[in-house]
Amino acid sequence: MTKTLRLKLLLLLNITCIGNGIVSAQQATDVQHSYNAGVPFLVNTFDVDQVRVVPIKGLENPFSMAFRDNGDILVTERYTGKLRLIRDGKLIEEDISGVPEIYTGEFRSGLMDVAFHPDDDRTIYLTHHKRIVVDGEEERVVVLIRARLMEDRLADVTEIFQAEGLDRGIAASKLMFTPDKKLLMSLGGAYMYAGYGEYAQDPSVHLGKLLRLNDDGTPVEDNPFIDT
């Protein structure tokens, strides 16, 4: 190999190594920018749709909301026990009729979450407090109902689940469907007054738990502790 050819090969090798180093450094920088929250980087927002904020007036103690495919929004009012309808950005004056009796006699009791079945947004689920009498004393429990939404009213209202345990704490309840169409229902109220969350560790009550239910309110067969 001649001296001139050897020199050309060395120059080519050096250029290749430098080029690879630049690419590697750039890749490392990209990775760092992608995963290191402490490094500032530019986020392109020019192709994001415009967002219009429309204030909705007239709601009282709104607790939760759910969206229909047609754009309607259902909103629960916790302390009034009303189910309200927002359509085309405006609150409909009349509330949805057919809602069962909601117990609102204690602080933080009332109508709570609202959710639609993933296969049919006319099938609606609500959680709320229900008044019961135990040994002559007025108590409250959390229940789950299912109903059919017919325009501006509920039909076929059915109580499909009642939580075990008297709610003497703050048993707020939320709903969410999983990808396999099981219904998750959270229940607060783990604290008994000034206690330390005893209900959360008590398998005999549902308070302080996250429940996994079928869409008819029955427990899923492969749930843990299903026989307790």
Task: Give residue ranges: language-model regions.
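N-terminal secretory signal peptides that target proteins for export/translocation
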Residues: M1-L5
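Bacterial N-terminal signal peptides
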Residues: K8-N20
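Bacterial Sec-dependent signal peptides at the C-terminal "C-region" and cleavage site
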Residues: C17-T29
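Acidic, Gly/Ser/Thr-rich repeat motifs that build Ca2+-stabilized beta-propeller blades
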Residues: Q26-A194
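Beta-propeller blade signature
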Residues: R140-E151, Y199-D216
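Short, surface-exposed recognition loops and adjoining beta-strand edges that mediate ligand/DNA contacts
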Residues: A163, I170, E221-T228
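The feature captures the short pre-catalytic strand/loop hairpin that immediately precedes
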Residues: M185-M192, T218-I226
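Short helix/strand-bridging catalytic loops that position acidic/His residues to coordinate divalent metals
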Residues: Y193-Q201, D227-T228
